[in-house]
Structure formats: structure tokens, C-alpha cells
């Protein structure tokens, strides 16, 4: 809560190995805050994330962090951002007004006309241009030293607006997780209408009742009787919904852009039943469909698909913590997307 605005924050992993999880979250955002390291500048992964934000049409603010240890100037950092698009505008308080409005005017014809007529650009026009992804506001600071944070929050309060919501129920599932008691939690964003406890939700070939609606803040939560449009909540009682599913009038998320690039074979220690290990991995796959867990009956092998070593370590840790299974994996191999489909003849 800041000023008169209440924000629901969805933090996503910054490491490239968890890009698929980040992508799933983008489909439920009203706005995104893209954090860039001032000490490292624009990285390839920054460009990948910005392309994903473009694909999902998410209005985007930028916070350039670690300016207390930055080796690059503001001008150099803004130059790096502008290589991804022209309309990254410095919203810092120290920017001269004429320079600020000049930059905004170059981003849309409407703002250009208003600037030429009045010498300024009203907040409503700026807000609309941000919503339409014509402008990407940039703020500078240091999260560690709390520098620039109030300025950023004030900018979010001033230049964001609640998007229009319909009356008929719609929701988008973005995460599946089990609570400490083993209850399956279906995390969703209510995109329109309202969800009430005991409402029956329908999916592809299934219909299940929402037993409980939880609003989480960290590890703590409170139960509510209903969740209105715009709210992010976790619902118990659903067993068939998966990340990316659309409920009610909401369409499902498009096929993900980012897919695993490596395949690993599970190495089971002596005495561990393969089917028990498969069941555990299937539960992890329920939360992360990109794992693509497969079982080869002939070879008695389990294979999973991952983005890299960091994600592999997390999977091993989850298997040990949640299921008591100390499972190893082989060196892994590249997932080739092309293969020979017919007879070929070598010459030479």
C-alpha cells in the first residue's frame, strides 16, 4: 500500500534458468517493473525479458538498481536501454522539464500535439501512453540503501491505473504449489467478475469446486469469502487446473516462448523404487509443466527437461525436502529440435 494505491507484487526469479517460471507470471500482470543492474548494464537476459514483456503486451516501468556502485553513467545506461526501443524516458526528479517533455513528445502524436499546444504533457496522457506501451518510465536508485525507492513508488502511484474489468467471471492460473499440509494450491489472477467460495470452476473436461480462497502475504495468508476482479489468490479444492489455464471467460495463455534446452536422466540410488521417484517428479511437473517428465518402460529410465545447472540443483533439493528422495542426475544433453526424417545418402 502506497498513498491511495494498493499493489500486489509478484516477484520472479532473475536467473536465466528460471525464465519459464517468469514467463508464466507475465500473463497475469497489469504492469511490470523491470530491474536492471546499474553496475552491469543491459545484459542479454534483460533483452530477453523485455521481448517477453512485448509479447504479452505488459506496460513496463524500469528501475536501474545499484547506482551506488555503478560503473556506468546514467547517460550510458539510458543509451543501452534505448537500443531496445526509443521511448525509454528518464522520469527522475532531476531531469529538466523541457528535456522530459521533449522526450515524451517524441513517443506519440497525441503527446506531441499537447506539448506543442500547451508546452506540457498532462499526467492523464502520460498514464495512457504508458498503458499502451508507448512510454517506458525509468527510475534510478539503490535498493540496498533505499535510494530512489520513494520516487519509484510515487511514479507507480501517479502513472498506473486499474485496467477495465468485465462482469463475467474469468481467471488465469499461473502457479501450482502444495502448502505444508499437502493441500494443492492453485494460484490465479481474477481477471473479471468475482470468484466466491464453493463456486464450481470448469476446465477442459473437468468441473471442481473452490473449497477455500486464500490471500497470501509471504508465507502467511488469510481466507476470504470472495475474490473480486484484479485480485491474486490461491484456491484449494482444484486438482485438474494447470499453469497457463484460463477459467471462465478468460482464454488460456499462449504457448511459452522459453522452453528447456537440456535433458537429464535420473540416477536412482540403490533401494529407491523408480515408480516412487516418477510419482515425486510428476508432482513437481504439476507445478512446472516445462519439466516434461517422461518414463521409458523399456529402459526403465526417467528423464526430465531443464534450463540448466541451477534449476537442476533446485529440483534435487525439492525431491529431498518434500519426498525424502536423494536422486542424482547424469551429465545431461542438449535437446535437439531437428532430426533426420528420411533416408540420406553420403557422398565423398
How should these model regions be labeled?
Residues 38-180, 201, 233:
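P-loop NTPase catalytic nucleotide-binding module
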Residues 159-161, 166-263, 301:
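Conserved nucleotide-binding/hydrolysis modules and their immediate coupling elements
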Residues 11, 25, 33, 46, ...:
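Residue-level signature of catalytic and energy-coupling elements of molecular machines
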Residues 19-40:
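Inter-motif core of Ras-like GTPase G domains
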Residues 3-7, 27-33, 107-111, 256-268:
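Gly-rich Lys/Arg/Thr-decorated short loops/hinges at beta-loop-alpha junctions or inter-strand turns
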Residues 18, 86-91, 122-123, 159-169, ...:
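Active-site phosphate-binding and catalytic loops of NTP-dependent enzymes
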Residues 5-18:
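Switch II (G3) loop of P-loop NTPases
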Residues 252-348:
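Charged, conformationally dynamic linker/hinge segments
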Amino acid at each position: 500500500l502506497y498513498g491511495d494505491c494498493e499493489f500486489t507484487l509478484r516477484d520472479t526469479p532473475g536467473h536465466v534458468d528460471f525464465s519459464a517460471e517468469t514467463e508464466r507470471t507475465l500473463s497475469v500482470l497489469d504492469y511490470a517493473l523491470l530491474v536492471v543492474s546499474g553496475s552491469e548494464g543491459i545484459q542479454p537476459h534483460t533483452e530477453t525479458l523485455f521481448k517477453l514483456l512485448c509479447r504479452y503486451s505488459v506496460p513496463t516501468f524500469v528501475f536501474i538498481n545499484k547506482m551506488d556502485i555503478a560503473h556506468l553513467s546514467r547517460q550510458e545506461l539510458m543509451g543501452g536501454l534505448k537500443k531496445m526501443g526509443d521511448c525509454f524516458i528518464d522520469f527522475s526528479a532531476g531531469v529538466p522539464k523541457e528535456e522530459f517533455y521533449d522526450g515524451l513528445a517524441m513517443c506519440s502524436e497525441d503527446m506531441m500535439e499537447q506539448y506543442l499546444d500547451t508546452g506540457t504533457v498532462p499526467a492523464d496522457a502520460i498514464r495512457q501512453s504508458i498503458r499502451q506501451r508507448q512510454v517506458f518510465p525509468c527510475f534510478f536508485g539503490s535498493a540496498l540503501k533505499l535510494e530512489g525507492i520513494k520516487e519509484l513508488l510515487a511514479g507507480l502511484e501517479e502513472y498506473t491505473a486499474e485496467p477495465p474489468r468485465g462482469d463475467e467471471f474469468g481467471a488465469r492460473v499461473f502457479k501450482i504449489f502444495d502448502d505444508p499440509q499437502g493441500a494443492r494450491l492453485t494460484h490465479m489472477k481474477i481477471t473479471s467478475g468475482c470468484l466466491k467460495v464453493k463456486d464450481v470452476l470448469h476446465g477442459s473436461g473437468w468441473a471442481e469446486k473452490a473449497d477455500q480462497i486464500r490471500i497470501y502475504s509471504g508465507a502467511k495468508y488469510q481466507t476470504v469469502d470472495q475474490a473480486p476482479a484484479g485480485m491474486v489468490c490461491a484456491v484449494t479444492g482444484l486438482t485438474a487446473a494447470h499453469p497457463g489455464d484460463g477459467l471462465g471467460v478468460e482464454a488460456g495463455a499462449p504457448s511459452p516462448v522459453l522452453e528447456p534446452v537440456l535433458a537429464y536422466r535420473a540416477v536412482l540410488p540403490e533401494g529407491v523404487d523408480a515408480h516412487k521417484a516418477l510419482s515425486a517428479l510428476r508432482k513437481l511437473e504439476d507445478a512446472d509443466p516445462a519439466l516434461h517428465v517422461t518414463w521409458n518402460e523399456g529402459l526403465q529410465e526417467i528423464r526430465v527437461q531443464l534450463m540448466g545447472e541451477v534449476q537442476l540443483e533446485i529440483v534435487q533439493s525439492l525431491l529431498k525436502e518434500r519426498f525424502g528422495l536423494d536422486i542424482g542426475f547424469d551429465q545431461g544433453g542438449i535437446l535437439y529440435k531437428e532430426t533426420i526424417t528420411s533416408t540420406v545418402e553420403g557422398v565423398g
